[in-house]
């Protein structure tokens, strides 16, 4: 009986989501934040604007419930593990 009870407790703990939430980097501060319930996708969105050749692409880091749809000319990468959307600033020469 004790073995059955212990097995049930272990299965319950493994199957339950014990309040775990994903963390994503978010702009403009580029700091890691805990995602609210239902938002488990981190993304990095990038695109060119007027000053793209001299300043590089614009970058937007965030979180969402699903990977956002983007317009042509906008690149997006989505992921679902903690802090999987880091931003590495490019070096100016």
Swiss-Prot record:
Entry GO terms, CC: extracellular region
MF GO annotations: acetylcholine receptor inhibitor activity; ion channel regulator activity; toxin activity
Localization, UniProt: Secreted
Disulfide bonds: 24-42, 48-52, 67-78, 79-84
Endpoints of the signal sequence: 1-21
Keywords of this entry: Acetylcholine receptor inhibiting toxin, Disulfide bond, Ion channel impairing toxin, Neurotoxin, Postsynaptic neurotoxin, Secreted, Signal, Toxin
Expressing tissues: Expressed by the venom gland.
InterPro entries reported for this sequence: Snake_3FTx (IPR003571), Snake_toxin-like_sf (IPR045860), Toxin_cobra-type (IPR054131)
Disulfide bond as UniProt keyword: yes
A Pfam family this chain is assigned to: Toxin_cobra-type
Family: Belongs to the three-finger toxin family. Long-chain subfamily. Type II alpha-neurotoxin sub-subfamily.
Role according to the record: Binds with high affinity to muscular (alpha-1/CHRNA1) and neuronal (alpha-7/CHRNA7) nicotinic acetylcholine receptor (nAChR) and inhibits acetylcholine from binding to the receptor, thereby impairing neuromuscular and neuronal transmission.
Protein name according to UniProt: Long neurotoxin LNTX22
Protein source organism: Ophiophagus hannah
